[in-house]
Curated annotation (Swiss-Prot):
InterPro entries given in the database record: Cation_efflux, Cation_efflux_CTD, Cation_efflux_CTD_sf, Cation_efflux_FieF, Cation_efflux_TMD_sf, CDF_Transporter
Compartments where found: Cell inner membrane
GO molecular function: cadmium ion transmembrane transporter activity; ferrous iron transmembrane transporter activity; metal ion binding; zinc efflux antiporter activity
Subunit structure: Homodimer.
Natural source organism: Cronobacter sakazakii (strain ATCC BAA-894)
Catalytic activity: Zn(2+)(in) + H(+)(out) = Zn(2+)(out) + H(+)(in); Cd(2+)(in) + H(+)(out) = Cd(2+)(out) + H(+)(in); Fe(2+)(in) + H(+)(out) = Fe(2+)(out) + H(+)(in)
Annotated protein name in UniProt: Cation-efflux pump FieF
Recorded name of the encoding gene: fieF
UniProt keyword terms in alphabetical order: Cell inner membrane, Cell membrane, Ion transport, Iron, Iron transport, Membrane, Metal-binding, Transmembrane, Transmembrane helix, Transport, Zinc, Zinc transport
Amino acid sequence: MNHDYGRLVSRAALAATLVATLLLIIKIFAWWYTGSVSILAALVDSLVDIAASLTNLLVVRYSLQPADEEHTFGHGKAESLAALAQSMFISGSALFLFLTGIQHLITPEPMRAPLVGIVVTVAALVTTLMLVTFQRWVVRKTRSQAVRADMLHYQSDVMMNGAILVALALSWYGLHRADALFALGIGVWILYSALRMGYEAIQSLLDRALPDDERQAIVDIVAAWPGVRGAHDLRTRQSGPTRFIQLHLEMEDNLPLVQAHLIAEQVEQAILSRFPGSDVIIHQDPCSVVPRFQQGQFEH
């Protein structure tokens, strides 16, 4: 397990939990003071953020545990389960916003002290932007699905806070239904983010192959290696931070077993240099046992 991976994803999960808690406290005060349904929407979203981020923090720590006798491939799939759980949390908050927004659209109420709401929303926007910037950096370094899921819903928070600012400004000028309309729009965006997040989590749980550029990098390494005539049955997937890579190398029939093994070891090390921490399995096939239509067909 890459030590940097564990350190970065743990810090990202902890940072998200602390930020969500701080924003919840601020938004409770702002909603109580202004009565804004848009700020209530943001408050509910912060409650969901805390639940999701706490879940993330616990699951990330569990997923970083090394493989054991019962989980020989490690615990990385826990990250995908966390992302799926987050999508459910967020979908629930979106439905709540729809109901609240419709109620206030039918019976709009004047907002109290919109300036306080604007100040609080600006503070929330800046804080969330800083968190998302940090999370994006962690995702770029680790490709953690759990942190990426967390980042997606905090990105939706940034958009939501921007929409709330506009709604508060319009309400200040007497357009009281704007608050409810923006709450409905925010609900649509949150629901979209949740569905996208759930789709990505399910794809990971179903062992979707690595991205095209990563598979192509593996093909390029193998195709250029001396002594390798071709390859087939390339299979890839990812569980947490670990990439699983399997393939068959095609070699000359008269190649000594020791030399064939050495070539396979060299190819494996080259792949590991490109994708550190991967689990690589390589099988060596004499060219004569590989059907002609299959020779050199990496993905078949």
